């Protein structure tokens, strides 16, 4: 993983040369991150950093999306502060994935809000103040419950290390209380209905890099927190509350998919589709099967490629040319923008889970695990595949089919920069769809280790009946 940070340092150095007067402290901070995976024994402050298969993949995805998010908006953003905020946000996410204790996880979980808040407040659309307030109030308030749960761990164990807390045997009542506190922050970050209302507003007003990183990486912190904070330690409570969470997930998938059919803003449509796909991830994560957990992580990776690509097209390429995001403004793009139309159709088919894409692998495994856990709710969740095909095909047919509307003027097709950006997102999605074992082998450590923890805790409870 040291090579990962070498690449990150090189990227920061390159950006400092391309962007005039880029602050050189960014290169220093990024270089210091190279040694962080080895600093696992800071006993004086109880902070631990390392990585495993799941963290490695999410960190690589973060590293992959950072330069794309900056280059996608290269022509519009001349401010040095804009690129510094994007790099700071990326560094916060990288450190968050390396944290091995709850305290440092919460610190960087909250610290990632600061650059995102500034990005939206300074470079967002007309209602950027409202969007910045939404993301701050929703996520900050919900995370306070997580902080209270972590404080209780500190009182009981005098330690918040993942390995130590995963071996702690708690009563069911205490587990349920901790589960409700932890899941409050995770449900807002995912987000699940009815706590999802902040995400469409934030996406519609956020700058392009903010939307790409929010959809591609920041939402993945919820799944990452679930597998780090809840499942190893609160396994009994997670089994107890799984039906309730499944009902929330199914309600989220149905509601967001149906309401997407009535939306006209292109960024809001993609934002609602992100909510639906993250609900599928939560279904697989709580399935208590290795199939579902693996599928949930694979779908997170797939969503990290496809959703930023769609945001790049509607919030970058089309908006730069027409300064409009209304769906009914566009029609017949395939007649004079064939390359952009082909790229959009490929990403749309991937987003609806078409076979031979990595999205199909993730959704199939997640729904398989959900059906094994709860057949009725899992079958209802499988209807989301049909609903996602409905709104995605409606959007694709409207933008690419027919003849152009009288409001549109003929513009140029994709530039070389935009073509390279699209290829860098489409090729991994299709390649991993043909060879999913490449990413599943990386991710195998996480569900396998989690399954071992669950078996071990079950054995302990059977051996000590009074616990």
Swiss-Prot record:
Keywords: Electron transport, Membrane, Mitochondrion, NAD, Respiratory chain, Translocase, Transmembrane, Transmembrane helix, Transport, Ubiquinone. The chain crosses the membrane at residues 21-40, 54-74, 79-99, 105-125, 135-155, 168-188, 207-227, 239-259, 266-286, 297-317, 330-350, 367-387, 420-440. NCBIfam families: NDH_I_M. It is an enzyme of class 7 (translocase). Belongs to the complex I subunit 4 family. It is a multi-pass membrane protein. It holds the Pfam family Proton_antipo_M. GO terms for molecular function: NADH dehydrogenase (ubiquinone) activity; ubiquinone binding. This is NADH-ubiquinone oxidoreductase chain 4. It comes from Debaryomyces hansenii (strain ATCC 36239 / CBS 767 / BCRC 21394 / JCM 1990 / NBRC 0083 / IGC 2968). Its EC number is 7.1.1.2. It is found in: Mitochondrion membrane. It catalyses: a ubiquinone + NADH + 5 H(+)(in) = a ubiquinol + NAD(+) + 4 H(+)(out). GO terms for biological process: ATP synthesis coupled electron transport; electron transport coupled proton transport. The lineage of its organism: Eukaryota, Fungi, Dikarya, Ascomycota, Saccharomycotina.
